[in-house]
């Protein structure tokens, strides 16, 4: 089904690259995609959770990269994003 096909801008992306997207990039890259319905804040929250889970088994270098990315969202305007970033940093 075409609605479930991979979209340009999403397939093959690393979590860190997706987490770095601005709201404009999120909106631009999810045009026509059902993922757009969750909104930018939930997008960031979900990726923060994924990064926290990835952090558990990450190498020291990858943990540094993950932590650096998470820190960029530590003061996000959304409380839910801030809470999940804080959780992810403790994993």
Segments from the language model and where they lie:
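Short coil turns that connect the paired helices of HEAT/ARM alpha-solenoid repeats
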Residues: 34-38, 72-80
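Conserved hydrophobic register position within alpha-solenoid helical repeats
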Residues: 47, 85-86
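Non-heme iron-sulfur electron-transfer modules
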Residues: 1-23, 66
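Surface-exposed acidic, glycine/proline-enriched linker/cap segments
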Residues: 17-36
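Amphipathic alpha-helical scaffolding segments comprising HEAT/armadillo-like alpha-solenoid repeats
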Residues: 25-29, 59-74
């Amino acid at each position: 089904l075409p609605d479930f096909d991979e979209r340009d801008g999403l397939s093959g992306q690393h979590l860190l690259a997706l987490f770095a997207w601005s709201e404009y990039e999120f909106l631009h890259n999810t045009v026509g995609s059902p993922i757009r319905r969750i909104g930018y804040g939930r997008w960031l929250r979900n990726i923060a959770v994924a990064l926290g889970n990835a952090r558990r088994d990450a190498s020291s270098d990858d943990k540094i990269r993950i932590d650096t990315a998470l820190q960029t969202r530590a003061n996000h305007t959304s409380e839910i994003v801030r809470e999940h970033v804080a959780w992810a940093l403790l994993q």
